[in-house]
């Protein structure tokens, strides 16, 4: 891994036909200095993004779960579920914007690339469970406790 670098470049001044006038009036070819401020951390993050195509494993993902309430009626329940996940150390975001659920799902899957989406409607709020959708697009019904246990184990095992 490289850290930030400083390089001498003899080729670019030649390619651009650069020259300066020296104190004695003669024309001289300059030597160009390049510096790269990106160090090993930035390069490593870039490699990770490229390797995983933005779909980080759950343990590494900045947002591990995105909670998507279907309507305003399920927003309070969505925040309750998110609180339970946060208590377990899961990085979670509630998307309680006034958007259609299809839009929220497409954004969470395609743009945000979160490992898990919890789609919560009135039915889930009444029954006290959650609809979990993973990256394979499979949706299953689970209890909150069951999902918290599963994702906590997945994060701890770094699977």
Task: Explain the meaning of each model-derived region.
Residues 1-159:
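NTP/phosphate- and nucleic-acid-binding module
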């Amino acid at each position: 891994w490289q850290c930030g670098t400083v390089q001498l470049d003899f080729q670019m001044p030649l390619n651009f036909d650069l020259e300066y006038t020296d104190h004695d009036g003669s024309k001289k070819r300059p030597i160009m200095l390049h510096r790269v401020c990106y160090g090993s951390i930035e390069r490593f993050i870039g490699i990770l993004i490229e390797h995983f195509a933005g779909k980080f494993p759950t343990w590494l993902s900045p947002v591990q779960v995105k909670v998507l309430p279907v309507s305003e009626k399920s927003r309070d329940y969505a925040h309750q579920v998110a609180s339970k996940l946060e208590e377990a150390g899961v990085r979670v975001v509630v998307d309680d914007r006034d958007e259609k659920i299809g839009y929220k799902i497409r954004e969470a899957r395609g743009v945000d690339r979160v490992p898990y989406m919890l789609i919560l409607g009135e039915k889930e709020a009444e029954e006290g469970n959650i609809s979990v959708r993973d990256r394979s697009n499979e949706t299953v019904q689970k209890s909150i406790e069951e999902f918290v246990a599963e994702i906590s184990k997945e994060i701890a095992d770094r699977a």
